[in-house]
């Protein structure tokens, strides 16, 4: 018996913390060079905060280290602005809808002051890919918000005033000329929709300091097949000494966000345009449609000009991945410099991005921003849904594309497992990328959660292993976006190095079969799994979407060759009502499994027959 007298006080253990290096992994939503200071460069990410590049150490520095779980708003930046005259100043807007801020720094983000915004903001909502939407000019801050239209502050964010844009609340971009007299604003067109499915006008111009706006020529709506909403929304804007250029995109199959969803972050765009404008007598006028190809099913988004060269990207191109174009005649003609794996050389310096792990293709997608360096016309940066990339060789034509992610870690870690022994030390399951099995703590993982062809599974919700044989692991991934892997239950016998997909438990019930049909579609949750302590029984709460129903829990003793359905009863032995559960095994007793009932009054089920039946127990 342990008492105070015989207790032994152990010496404190000193822990050292670091991160397992993955590299990139998430959506970089915008790139911001300072126009005159060659050592000031920022990016924003959808869920990973703002980063500043350290040119001396050649790595990205994370600026949200002080963020807490109680107030995570800075991890969701929506827009960045800089002071053209003072490279030390940094402004960015951020929010999680509950807390919404304009953040101001006088030392490049080392110290940040938050001031509350009068509108809802979220850096991981639809529209995050467009911009820019924050401007600092002549002591004023201008913000094109997602929910309150255009607002501005003359006292560094202490107070804000609204500017009416024909009732439009969802702004996609704002831009002003060097003198701050000419303004252009893009919007979703929702407020002026004639019928609820066709956007109203989406592009406006002001020449009187934002006192009034007039419509600026924009593409007419096109009723694309399979499109949910019709009409083109401005995505990005750039200018040079001769022209202003604006990219547009038209929604595809929008599954969320309604007409407020207008950018690549809905995952589908039906069409795109690139328009060129000129300034006549202080007024912006339409000059020419310079769209490279009207017949490609995609949008156009990233665009940048330095006066000599114009760069442009497609976004959400359905077949072959996004393309990058260059023009040296203001868009009169275009040259492709990247199309899938063609036209450019690639240096895949991050292992999981290699084509052989991505169906033999290019992992680049969601190019919504591209920026030429103001200080090196041979170099440009572009964003993707899996990190930041650099282009070099633009002047010579020997174009090299490579990830530029050193220091950027923007992955969603859904669970992590340590192995007591085995060839790998850490099993890390991740949103979007699936998972990695790390042999050691100091090097990147080559590739892990993939099928026999190297095609990656994505977004595992959980995994399980036994203490007796940690080489034997089960996991529940989604099938990837290309359809080259299908979701379900996967099994590894070599500690996560290789995987096989187990047969589906079809025929147990129509309810389960419907869920299995859904799981075979791209990017659908497959469920929750657990394995008995002796490694001989695998449990699976089948999902096929959100939640893990207790009516869809099954088990196998022969790695999926045959399946049986688990039975759930309440504390009286009657059939339990349907609700979601998560299954867990006892790590020592092979007969014991537990199920946590995810409902308003949380419940606990226990199985003493290896998961065949679960009975609810009373808990206090």
Regions found by a protein language model. Name each.
Residues 1-620:
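Extracellular glycan-interacting surfaces
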């Amino acid at each position: 018996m342990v008492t105070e007298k015989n207790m032994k006080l152990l010496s404190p253990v000193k822990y050292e913390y670091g991160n397992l290096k993955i590299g990139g992994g998430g959506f970089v939503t915008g790139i911001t060079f300072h126009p005159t200071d060659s050592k000031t460069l920022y990016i924003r990410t959808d869920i990973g905060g703002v980063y500043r590049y350290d040119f001396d150490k050649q790595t990205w520095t994370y600026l949200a280290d002080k963020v807490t779980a109680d107030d995570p708003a800075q991890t969701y930046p929506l827009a960045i602005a800089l002071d053209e005259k003072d490279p030390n100043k940094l402004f960015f807007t951020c929010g999680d809808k509950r807390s919404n801020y304009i953040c101001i720094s006088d030392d490049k983000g080392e110290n940040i002051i938050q001031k509350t915004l009068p509108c809802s903001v979220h850096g991981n909502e639809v529209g995050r890919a467009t911009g820019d939407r924050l401007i600092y000019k002549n002591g004023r801050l201008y913000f094109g918000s997602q929910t309150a239209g255009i607002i501005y502050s003359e006292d560094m964010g202490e107070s804000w005033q609204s500017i009416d844009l024909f009732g439009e609340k969802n702004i996609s971009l704002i831009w002003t000329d060097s003198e701050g007299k000419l303004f252009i604003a893009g919007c979703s067109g929702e407020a002026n929709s004639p019928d609820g499915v066709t956007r109203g006008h989406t592009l406006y111009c002001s020449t009187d300091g934002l006192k009034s706006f007039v419509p600026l020529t924009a593409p007419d709506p096109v009723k694309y097949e399979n499109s949910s909403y019709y009409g083109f929304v401005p995505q990005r804007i750039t200018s040079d000494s001769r022209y202003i250029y604006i990219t547009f995109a038209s929604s595809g199959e929008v599954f969320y966000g309604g007409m407020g969803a207008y950018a690549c972050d809905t995952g589908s765009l039906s069409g795109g345009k690139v328009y060129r404008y000129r300034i006549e007598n202080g007024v912006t006028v339409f000059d020419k449609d310079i769209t490279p190809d009207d017949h490609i099913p995609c949008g156009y988004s990233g665009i940048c000009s330095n006066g000599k060269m114009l760069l442009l990207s497609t976004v959400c191109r359905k077949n072959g991945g996004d393309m990058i174009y260059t023009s040296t005649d203001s868009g009169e003609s275009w040259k492709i410099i990247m199309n899938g794996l063609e036209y450019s050389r690639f240096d895949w310096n991050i292992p999981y991005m290699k084509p052989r792990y991505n169906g033999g293709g290019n992992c680049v997608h969601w190019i919504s921003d591209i920026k030429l360096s103001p200080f090196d016309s041979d170099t440009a940066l572009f964003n993707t849904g899996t990190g930041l990339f650099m282009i070099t060789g633009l002047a010579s034509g020997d174009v090299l594309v490579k990830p530029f992610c050193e220091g950027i870690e923007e992955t969603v870690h859904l669970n992590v497992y340590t192995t007591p022994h085995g060839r790998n030390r850490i099993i890390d399951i991740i949103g979007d990328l699936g998972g990695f099995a790390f042999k050691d703590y100091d090097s990147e993982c080559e590739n892990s959660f993939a099928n026999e062809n190297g095609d990656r599974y994505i977004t595992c919700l959980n995994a399980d292993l036994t203490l007796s044989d940690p080489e034997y692991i089960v996991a529940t991934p989604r099938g990837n976006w290309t359809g080259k892997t299908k979701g379900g239950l996967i099994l590894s016998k070599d500690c996560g190095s290789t995987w096989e997909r187990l047969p589906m438990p079809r025929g147990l019930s129509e309810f389960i079969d419907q869920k299995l049909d859904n799981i075979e579609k791209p990017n659908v949750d497959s469920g929750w799994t657990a394995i008995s302590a002796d490694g001989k029984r695998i449990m699976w709460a089948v999902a096929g979407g959100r939640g893990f129903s207790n009516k869809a829990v099954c088990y196998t003793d022969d790695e999926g060759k045959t399946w049986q359905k688990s039975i759930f009863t309440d504390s009286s032995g009657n059939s339990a009502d349907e609700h979601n559960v998560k299954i867990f095994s006892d790590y020592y007793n092979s007969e014991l499994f537990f199920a946590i009932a995810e409902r308003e009054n949380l419940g606990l089920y226990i199985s003493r027959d290896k998961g065949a039946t679960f009975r609810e127990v009373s808990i206090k």
